[in-house]
Design a protein with these regions (language model features):
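Transmembrane and membrane-interface helices of multi-pass
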Residues: 2-231
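Alpha-helix initiation and N-capping motif
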Residues: 18, 114, 124, 216-220, ...
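Short coil/turn linker and secondary-structure boundary residues
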Residues: 37, 122, 217, 232-234, ...
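Short alpha-helical "patches" and their helix-cap loops
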Residues: 78-82, 233-243, 338-343, 543-545
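Long, well-ordered, tryptophan-enriched scaffold segments
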Residues: 136-138, 242-247, 379
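The feature marks either
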Residues: 204, 208, 215-220, 224-262, ...
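Solvent-exposed soluble domains appended to multi-pass membrane proteins
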Residues: 249-611
């Protein structure tokens, strides 16, 4: 009995030790982020991260515990082979999760969840486009080496039998003792006997989010995310549904008051519309907003010539979330993406569908893979009639990691505009891709690789608009220039508010005059605002608000996997969803947006559940 109990405890605490040691490795790998931390900070991270390590170790020790019980009844070699196979699989899975998390954190700024699985299986090529061949190769080699090291440790400590375990005389007693020990794993797995079960918030201990992120066990984070993907009506339950309904009713678009009038931004109600959705752009690239000079020179020019929304925010952090925000006025979700569920996107209203009913001809242009993240099904269900994507360009023109570079994309669009008879009015959605990792572009104006890629994308947009101005279509065209999500420059940004600020600019012959709109808004508000300007109904867009309506509440709302933000003129608030605590609270009315932000997210998941 004693040997089996020792082996059981050794298995459990070996898993714990391996998880604990991953934390300083993570911090050393990202030493640029942790340059000013002390040795004591390393130990604090390891200590506070223990709850998740203990929990996951409990899950992983359950099967070895059952095998030890079985070994009290038979010494069959099958048990040894199962044991060897189990630890081999676990070593490989642990290595894959740790190395993938190590590689992705630098791009995404949060620990591994189930998101990469969706991206990879929707389009493996595009999922890998952000990184170089050598980065992938080094990652694979690192996984294999780390898996081999883990298995060697498991073999030396747990698998190799110096003296095979004998079948005990009192096997019933041994089995009962091991069964009780295995059952006791429920305690660390669940996190104790309190009402709340184990979750990521258990390891949050610092106001410095770097420390909290380092304390997270990436394997637990991935498992938790994967097992909580679809129970939307159980997620983010902050308050009684009636209270959430009451608060949400204050945050939706309102009828125009009798004493108010909506400022008309356009000189026509049926302009041709071209959306240019700019990959990863941010206000930090524009001198207009106090950002980098001499980078987005055309966007700076458009900001002066057109209608600039100066307090505008990205709804989320990835294209699949951002596109749904722009086109359907649907907020990004922290734990999933509505694009994963075609049966739900089929039921969402969209700008293209509304414009199609108004007689618009609809087209979508993208140099990359339109099947990435289920984009094609979303676009088709939104009413898009013609989709131009990477497969529509010859191989010689698909020189970028994401497919056709931006200048090729705009050349194709201009060619189609000139050669094909345009049915007016039309809507064209144009999505750029070159200003994305790995930032490799056929353009060399700036020394900084990242800034140069944005300058390239900006030049492509500028060249296209300049050519378009020379066509008869210009006079009756509205351009909507907006990034697909939060910006990729600079990185990292410690203040989450700064990371979400993006430009929204309207230009074209269809606008009345240049204007700066300083109302707080986000991508979800484009739908209601545009349709209102066109005199079209937008009641179906539950979460979208008309920015120009004085009677409507004005706020920006955004999410990432670990927080939401609600921004108004008097309160800028960010709430950490992992730690269940306020992460940032600024303005003259601190805390004013907390309950509203919670209610908004709760109602978003209510809506997601019933779709």
């Amino acid at each position: 009995m004693k040997k089996r109990i020792i082996q059981f405890l050794t298995t459990y605490f070996l898993f714990v030790l391996l998880f604990v040691l991953q934390k300083p490795i993570f911090m050393v790998y990202y030493h640029d982020l942790y340059t000013n931390v002390s040795l004591g900070d390393y130990f604090r991270v390891m200590w506070h991260g223990l709850p998740l390590d203990l929990s996951l170790a409990g899950y992983l020790t359950a099967i070895p515990g059952l095998l030890l019980i079985a070994s009290a009844w038979t010494n069959s070699s099958i048990l040894r082979r199962i044991r060897q196979g189990y630890f081999g699989v676990i070593a490989f899975i642990m290595a894959c999760i740790f190395i993938i998390d190590l590689g992705l954190y630098g791009f995404w700024g949060f620990r591994l969840d189930a998101t990469p699985v969706f991206y990879f299986f929707s389009s493996p090529k595009d999922a890998m486009a952000s990184v170089s061949f050598w980065f992938v190769l080094l990652g694979i080699l690192s996984m294999l080496i780390y898996a081999a090291i883990l298995y060697f440790i498991f073999y030396c400590v747990l698998i190799r039998e110096k003296k095979p375990l004998k079948i005990p005389y009192r096997r019933q007693n041994v089995s009962l003792a091991l069964l009780l020990l295995t059952a006791a794993l429920f305690i660390p797995i669940r996190g104790g006997f309190s009402v709340s079960t184990m979750n990521l918030s258990k390891v949050y201990f610092s106001q410095d989010q770097r420390m909290n992120h380092a304390a997270i066990n990436p394997a637990f984070s991935f498992m938790y995310s994967a097992t909580h993907q679809n129970n939307f009506d159980k997620q983010y339950r902050f308050m009684d549904p009636k209270i959430a309904d009451e608060l949400f009713a204050e945050m939706v678009d309102k009828p125009v008051a009798a004493t108010d009038s909506i400022p008309q931004l356009l000189n026509t109600q049926r302009p041709n519309i071209i959306f240019i959705i700019l990959e990863s752009f941010s206000t930090h690239l524009m001198e207009t907003f106090g950002g980098q000079p001499n980078v987005a020179v055309n966007m700076d020019k458009f900001a002066k010539e057109g209608i600039l929304f100066s307090n505008f925010y990205g709804s989320s952090f990835r294209t699949d979330r951002g596109l749904a925000s722009i086109i359907s006025g649907y907020p990004g979700q922290p734990s999933t993406s509505i694009m994963k569920y075609p049966e739900k996107t089929d039921k969402r209203p969209s700008i293209p569908r509304s414009l199609k009913n108004a007689g618009y001809n609809l087209e979508y242009y993208y140099g990359g893979d339109a099947d990435f993240t289920n984009m094609r099904s979303y676009l088709v269900s939104s009413g898009i009639e013609k989709i131009i994507s990477d497969k529509d360009f010859p191989l010689s023109e698909r020189t970028g990691k994401w497919g056709a570079q931006d200048h090729v994309l705009f050349q194709r669009l201009m060619k189609d505009l000139k050669e094909e008879k345009q049915k007016e009015p039309f809507l064209k959605l144009v999505q750029t891709s070159s200003s994305h990792e790995p930032f490799e572009v056929p353009f060399h104006r700036l020394d900084d690789k990242i800034l140069n890629s944005f300058a390239y994308a900006d030049s492509c947009v500028g060249d296209f608009v300049k050519q378009y101005q020379e066509t008869p279509l210009w006079k009756n065209t509205l351009f909507v220039l907006v990034p697909d999500h939060q910006g990729a420059y600079p990185y990292p940004i410690e203040n989450p508010l700064d990371g979400q600020t993006i430009p929204l600019i309207l230009i074209g012959g269809a606008i009345k005059q240049p204007l700066v709109v300083d109302t707080y808004a986000s991508q979800i508000d484009i739908a209601a605002t545009l349709l209102a300007q066109l005199g079209l109904p937008h009641d179906e867009f539950t979460f979208s608000k008309n920015i120009m309506n004085p009677a409507s509440p004005h706020f920006a709302y955004f999410t990432r996997p670990n927080y939401f933000g609600m921004i108004t003129a008097d309160n800028q608030l960010v709430y950490n969803l992992d730690a269940n605590t306020v992460q940032l609270d600024e303005g003259t009315a601190k805390g004013a947006n907390l309950e509203k932000g919670k209610a908004f997210l709760q109602k978003l998941y209510d809506d997601l559940a019933k779709r």
